[in-house]
């Protein structure tokens, strides 16, 4: 597939750039949303900018993973890059919020192909004994990109304009495109096969319904509104139809027989659970720094750097030792560090020093990092190459689904706890200060408005925010404990050289 070691390194560089763009894109845009809304207006539509991207990414992952198994990795990776670049350029020139949302949907179609196919190409071009190190490298880039996004977004918005949050993808993508087109030569032969159109259609409708329900629920519409209930009902119905369709399809989008394999099934559960807990760290640690410590947006972004470094270390360790011991043993190290770090984060108060927060972040990042390199490898362990794309895209899909559900569920809980704490703190006081700040906590993030709040009032608000955030860190221990139990069932398998591959049963 690759003619020399030099070319191999260039292909890996091209894949890393693709992962860098797709993993960083949503978090880097989130930081710039305030500026974008101020420029384009239509505040009531800004949620669609994120929703449109996530919907098409999630819908595209399993479909492109399967298509890459059927017709080859290179053509669909290049397709994903081109669509992502076109979408990024269009986003940069958007003049209305509606235009930006449509262009983000286009961008998401490309993003849905980049991540799963990049990991699968690595499994194709490297022998088993080297895959661990390479997936560790790719996993480290994924973790770093996700955490680096908010910080980079803040700097780009401040020093240039929000347009460059999207334009920055263009030169990166062009370099990635050049490296893959020139140096990656796919040798596998792919016969023409029947595409599972019915499965693709029902999956897209199911995913779109679920994603819009999660993205719009509690924001555009209340959770018990007809719109949200209708979306959840649509998801349930089309997902059931999808399952029945896949059981009869010649080439199903998701091969459910793989879930009969213990290592594959447990890896998917862990991807979902780790995704659900990882996202709350990336979202709520910066909020804690800004609202509780009174830091700036840049300071909040920088505070994630220790977690980023910890995740890089964890991903590297997990990758290197895949051939030395079982996936289960390595994941036990992961979940132990992850649990300890999250537990320590749940004990924070407004008096907790930033040094201690930094140490907590390194520990939780180290535990989290293992999952970035181990779970994709475990998902394709001993699988026939023609199923790798589908297996890896399923893992990416479930991690992303976990992230979406996690930020929705934990975000709702945090908001409710914050309001309850404020009402309790200001109970019996005149003026309704608690209700005022429950409705507009943004005043805590702006130094000018924050300085105008009376000190005794500010102390109560800060304590309420601190309690609400540490409360969800404590609740996050539940899925982490479930992860620990799941790890027990992974078995003793590890990366072995010249191991017989498993075909469909």
Q: PLM features: residue spans?
A:
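A generic transmembrane-helix signature of 12-TM secondary carrier transporters
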Residues: 19, 81, 85-88, 103-104, ...
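Hydrophobic transmembrane architecture of multi-pass small-molecule transporters
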Residues: 400-489, 497, 503-505
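Small-residue-rich alpha-helical segments with characteristic i,i+4
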Residues: 144, 148, 357-435
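C-terminal membrane-cytosol helix-exit motif in multi-pass small-molecule transporters
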Residues: 171-188, 204-216, 234-248, 483-491
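Cytoplasmic loop-to-transmembrane helix junctions
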Residues: 45, 130-137, 299, 387-394
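Helix-loop-helix hairpins in multi-pass membrane proteins, especially solute transporters
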Residues: 61-198, 216
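Transmembrane core module of solute transporters
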Residues: 8-61, 99, 161, 198-200, ...
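Interfacial helix-cap and linker-helix signal at transmembrane-aqueous boundaries
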Residues: 36-37, 67-68, 152-160, 214, ...
């Amino acid at each position: 597939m690759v003619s020399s070691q030099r070319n191999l390194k260039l292909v890996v560089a091209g894949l890393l750039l693709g992962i860098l763009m797709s993993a960083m894109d949503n978090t880097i845009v989130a930081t710039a949303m305030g500026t974008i809304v101020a420029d384009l207006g239509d505040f009531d539509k800004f949620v669609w900018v994120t929703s449109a991207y996530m919907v098409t990414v999630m819908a595209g992952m399993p479909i492109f993973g399967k298509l890459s198994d059927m017709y080859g990795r290179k053509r669909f990776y290049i397709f994903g890059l081109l669509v992502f670049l076109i979408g990024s350029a269009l986003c940069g020139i958007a003049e209305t919020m509606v235009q930006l949302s449509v262009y983000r949907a286009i961008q998401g179609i490309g993003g849905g192909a980049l991540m799963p196919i990049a990991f699968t190409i690595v499994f194709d071009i490297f022998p088993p004994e080297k895959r661990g190190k390479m997936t560790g490298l790719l996993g480290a880039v994924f973790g770093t990109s996700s955490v680096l996004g908010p910080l980079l977004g803040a700097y780009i918005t401040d020093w240039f304009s929000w347009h460059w949050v999207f334009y920055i993808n263009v030169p990166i993508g062009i370099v990635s495109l050049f490296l893959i087109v020139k140096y990656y030569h796919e040798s596998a032969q792919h016969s023409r096969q029947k595409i599972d159109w019915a499965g693709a259609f029902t999956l897209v409708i199911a995913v779109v319904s679920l994603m819009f329900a999660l993205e719009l629920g509690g924001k555009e519409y209340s959770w018990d509104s007809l719109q949200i209930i209708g979306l959840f009902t649509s998801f349930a119905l089309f997902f059931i139809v999808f399952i029945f369709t896949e059981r009869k399809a010649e080439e199903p989008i998701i091969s459910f027989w793989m879930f009969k394999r213990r290592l594959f099934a447990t890896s998917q559960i862990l991807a979902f659970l780790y995704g659900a807990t990882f996202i709350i760290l990336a979202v709520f640690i910066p909020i804690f720094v800004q609202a509780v410590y009174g830091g700036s947006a840049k300071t909040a972004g920088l505070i994630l750097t220790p977690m980023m470094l910890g995740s890089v270390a964890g991903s590297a360790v997990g990758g290197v030792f895949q051939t030395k011991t079982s996936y289960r043993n390595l994941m036990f190290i992961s979940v132990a560090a992850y649990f300890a770090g999250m537990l320590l984060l749940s004990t924070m108060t407004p008096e907790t020093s930033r040094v201690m927060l930094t140490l907590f972040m390194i520990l939780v990042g180290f535990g989290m990092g293992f999952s970035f390199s181990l779970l994709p490898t475990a998902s394709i362990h001993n699988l026939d190459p023609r199923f790798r794309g589908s297996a890896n895209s399923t893992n990416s899909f479930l991690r992303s689904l976990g992230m979406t559900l996690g930020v929705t569920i934990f975000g709702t809980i945090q908001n409710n706890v914050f309001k309850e704490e404020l009402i309790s703190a200001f109970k019996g006081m005149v003026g309704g200060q608690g209700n005022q700040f429950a409705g507009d906590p943004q005043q805590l993030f702006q130094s000018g408005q924050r300085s105008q709040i009376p000190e005794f009032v500010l102390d109560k608000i800060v304590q309420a925010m601190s309690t609400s955030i540490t409360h969800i860190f404590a609740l996050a221990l539940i899925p982490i404990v479930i992860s620990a139990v799941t790890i027990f069932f992974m078995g003793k398998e590890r990366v072995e050289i010249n191991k017989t591959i498993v075909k469909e049963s």
